[in-house]
């Protein structure tokens, strides 16, 4: 039987993680290594300034105390497997990870860490609005992720080394689901948002709020943003090399000025 290392960034008690573990357990031996608390927005951050400790929850189920998702992958591979697993899956995230959000996502950061370790990796996220997640749950996301994992096991991982797959599920019920499409990451426009306050000792603090994010749907019709809003699930190949190759020649000319 194949072996899967499963993690997330919503914490070891998150419903998306537990339901996906149950679903993937039908085709693989699933070992869970998840953060003890929510670590959204942690990207591929690793904890380098203090020791970390695995706490066993159940058979093949561990939480890593106050760790990041990337920590869970890194130490999960080091401590929980004698040989590398066949696949690393991160999710199901409670919320989409699309466009530039991918760069700060803890869910995608875990998949990136897996890819850098040379292991096929898949990030899975469920888009939701309002109470749609409570109403629809993770059944559709589990089904689609299951099919993608089966395809990986049957046909091999379709990407080059150090690349991973980013799967996003639309906020629709099964009867309104339009299918799975390959899509590039879209583009958003970001602004800051934070609440100011004074702590009991009279010191000023800031509490980061939900980022003000906007996008032009006309420019994103065939991206993960547009297709997700139309009821499609999207599968996007992601690589860690963020070099803007098309700018290199222009930058060399600029440097000579």
Curated annotation (Swiss-Prot):
Family membership noted in the UniProt record: Belongs to the SurE nucleotidase family.
GO cellular component terms, A-Z: cytoplasm
Keywords for this protein: Cytoplasm, Hydrolase, Metal-binding, Nucleotide-binding
Keyword ATP-binding attributed: no
Gene3D superfamilies per the UniProt record, alphabetical: Survival protein SurE-like phosphatase/nucleotidase
Main location: cytoplasm
Molecular function via GO: 3'-nucleotidase activity; 5'-nucleotidase activity; exopolyphosphatase activity; metal ion binding; nucleotide binding
Organism domain of life: Bacteria
Zinc-finger among keywords: no
Enzyme Commission code: 3.1.3.5
EC primary class: hydrolase
Cystine connections: none
Reactions catalysed according to its record: a ribonucleoside 5'-phosphate + H2O = a ribonucleoside + phosphate
Protein name, as recorded: 5'-nucleotidase SurE
Named cofactor requirement(s): a divalent metal cation
Gene responsible for this protein: surE
Note describing how the cofactor binds: Binds 1 divalent metal cation per subunit.
Subcellular location: Cytoplasm
